């Protein structure tokens, strides 16, 4: 049997394997402790944290759809101070890397969170630029290349950990957005966030979600995610974390072939709490089947 090396390097941080959780689908790991040995994961990407506690959106926030789900949780979180006090000590019990997803309503919001995390024992930061920019009339940060470069540059200036920028797919062309993030100093790119979607209750003749629209995720979005990862991998020279509809090891291998260094498992966690472990084992099985000793051999090899 081929001895396989699943280690990957994301912006100078070595992970034991490429598999991590997608932000917002795994909390800070406590909820899954009964099912998943966190020591086996390459990294835990925690639910987005903001400078102050966010209440999130009104219910209903979740709607099942064909091939996936819609969510409109609204980044409910207790704030970065509570995260530092309670969640980091919990996660540091495990031999896994910690990636903190950061939310904000203004550039200043993002920077304040990053400053507070400066001396915290975390490994990487993930900047969620799918948030609306309150100072720009609610326009999503991640849909405008100028804003993407501006917010990335500001956050990078105060960040002490490597900075990953998470891209929204709700754009005409993902490549200028990725290039803007790199121009702003991003050490890596993660994509995709959720697609904007909607579901309607035909009996009540009302939207199912209280917020009307929400983020669409699950296996149905994988072809879109793969296409965007492939495009970005061919356009920028920084590590990429690919996500969007990953349910199995085979799905993850597709993302690696498209150019991703890491892969994040999201919606699958709700269906199968052990999804991350299954994906790790699936990648390992694929490598053994094809006598692949190191993931570098196949990354971006299309």
Curated annotation (Swiss-Prot):
Stated name of the protein: Dihydroorotate dehydrogenase B (NAD(+)), catalytic subunit
Required cofactor(s): FMN
Similarity annotation: Belongs to the dihydroorotate dehydrogenase family. Type 1 subfamily.
GO molecular function: dihydroorotate dehydrogenase (NAD+) activity
Summary of subunit composition and partner proteins: Heterotetramer of 2 PyrK and 2 PyrD type B subunits.
Organism: Alkaliphilus metalliredigens (strain QYMF)
Source organism phylogeny: Bacteria, Bacillati, Bacillota, Clostridia, Peptostreptococcales
Catalytic activity entry: (S)-dihydroorotate + NAD(+) = orotate + NADH + H(+)
Residues bound to substrate: 47, 71-75, 128, 193-194
Cited HAMAP family: DHO_dh_type1
């Amino acid at each position: 049997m081929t001895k396989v090396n699943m280690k990957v390097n994301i912006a100078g941080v070595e992970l034991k394997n490429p598999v991590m959780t997608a932000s917002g689908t795994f909390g800070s790991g406590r909820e899954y402790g009964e099912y998943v040995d966190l020591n086996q994961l390459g990294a835990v990407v925690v639910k987005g944290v903001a400078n102050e506690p966010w209440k999130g959106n009104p219910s209903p926030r979740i709607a099942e759809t064909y091939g996936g789900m819609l969510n409109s949780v609204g980044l409910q979180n207790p704030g970065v101070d509570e995260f530092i006090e309670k969640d980091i000590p919990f996660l540091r019990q495990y031999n896994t890397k910690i990636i903190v997803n950061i939310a904000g309503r203004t550039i200043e919001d993002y920077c304040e969170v990053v400053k507070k995390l400066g001396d915290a024992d975390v490994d990487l930061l993930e900047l969620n630029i799918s948030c609306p920019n309150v100072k720009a009339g609610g326009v999503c940060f991640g849909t405008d290349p100028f804003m993407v470069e501006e917010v990335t540059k500001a956050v990078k200036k105060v960040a002490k950990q490597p900075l990953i920028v998470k891209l929204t797919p709700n754009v005409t062309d993902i490549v200028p957005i990725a290039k803007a993030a790199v121009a702003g100093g991003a050490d890596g790119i993660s994509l995709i966030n959720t697609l904007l979607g909607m579901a309607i209750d035909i009996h009540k003749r009302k939207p199912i979600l209280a917020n009307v629209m929400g983020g669409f995720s699950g296996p149905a979005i994988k072809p879109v995610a793969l296409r965007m990862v492939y495009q970005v991998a061919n356009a920028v020279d920084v590590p990429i974390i690919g996500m969007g509809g990953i349910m199995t090891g085979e799905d993850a291998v597709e993302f690696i072939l498209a150019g991703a260094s890491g892969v994040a498992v999201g919606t699958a966690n709700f269906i199968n709490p052990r999804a991350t472990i299954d994906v790790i084992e699936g990648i390992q099985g694929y490598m053994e089947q094809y006598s692949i000793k190191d993931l570098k051999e196949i990354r971006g090899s299309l």
